[in-house]
Amino acid sequence: MFHKELLKLYFICGTTTCQGKNLYTVVEEALKGGITLFQFREKGEGALEGLEKLELAIQIKELCKKYNVPFIVNDDIDLAMEIDADGVHVGQDDIGVDEIRKLMPDKIIGLSIRNEEEFQQSKVEYVDYVGVGPVFGTQSKDDAGGTIGYEGLELMRKLLPQMPLVAIGGIQTKHIKDIIKTNMDGVSIISAISYAKNIEKTVREMSEQ
């Protein structure tokens, strides 16, 4: 069952976006700090594939379960179904959300939308939440596209007044208060958590914003 409070502090990570640290340990520290949702995003140069990816996904899914935090898979619908993940998150160029809803009727489905043009072509009636961004410049995602700033967040809230919305892209602790003022339901973060020296403490500080 999805509710918008899950978006409050949404951590996204994979082995290629945690500076060579052990991903399991990184996620465990973030869970201890109080993340509300986790997305396994195994992409980019050197990303795990096949059995290695599957085994790690299962381990982290079980870890998230221990903390009652839903486990979302980025893009890989087959993996999400195979390991019975709590949901999937897809971009504009991935499989259509209407198709995913047929395959995963009871799961959480998230969709990335950057601007009004993408909004017009999106079947938002099939999704549980929308990821809006990139708000700021980001090193974590090489496919992120142009930044939208706070204005872009405000526009998306006007276009989707009732939809649970989470901001993404280059977000640091200092930005969170201003992002929430744009009526976002939460923030999704990659490197500001995974690169932190003390992940648990950083996450705690973020959740207090």
From Swiss-Prot:
Catalytic reactions of this protein: 2-[(2R,5Z)-2-carboxy-4-methylthiazol-5(2H)-ylidene]ethyl phosphate + 4-amino-2-methyl-5-(diphosphooxymethyl)pyrimidine + 2 H(+) = thiamine phosphate + CO2 + diphosphate; 2-(2-carboxy-4-methylthiazol-5-yl)ethyl phosphate + 4-amino-2-methyl-5-(diphosphooxymethyl)pyrimidine + 2 H(+) = thiamine phosphate + CO2 + diphosphate; 4-methyl-5-(2-phosphooxyethyl)-thiazole + 4-amino-2-methyl-5-(diphosphooxymethyl)pyrimidine + H(+) = thiamine phosphate + diphosphate
**Where on this chain does Mg(2+) bind?**
75, 94
Q: Which GO terms describe its molecular function?
A: magnesium ion binding; thiamine-phosphate diphosphorylase activity
Q: What class of enzyme is it?
A: transferase
Obligatory cofactor(s) = Mg(2+)
Query: Which amino acid positions bind 2-[(2R,5Z)-2-carboxy-4-methylthiazol-5(2H)-ylidene]ethyl phosphate, per UniProt?
Result: 138-140, 170, 190-191
Q: What Enzyme Commission number(s) does the record list for this chain? A: 2.5.1.3
Q: Coiled-coil annotation: which residues?
A: none
Q: Name one GO biological process term.
A: thiamine diphosphate biosynthetic process
Role played: Condenses 4-methyl-5-(beta-hydroxyethyl)thiazole monophosphate (THZ-P) and 2-methyl-4-amino-5-hydroxymethyl pyrimidine pyrophosphate (HMP-PP) to form thiamine monophosphate (TMP).
Name this polypeptide is given: Thiamine-phosphate synthase 1
Instruction: Say which species the protein is native to.
Output: Streptococcus pneumoniae serotype 4 (strain ATCC BAA-334 / TIGR4)
Q: What gene is it encoded by?
A: thiE1
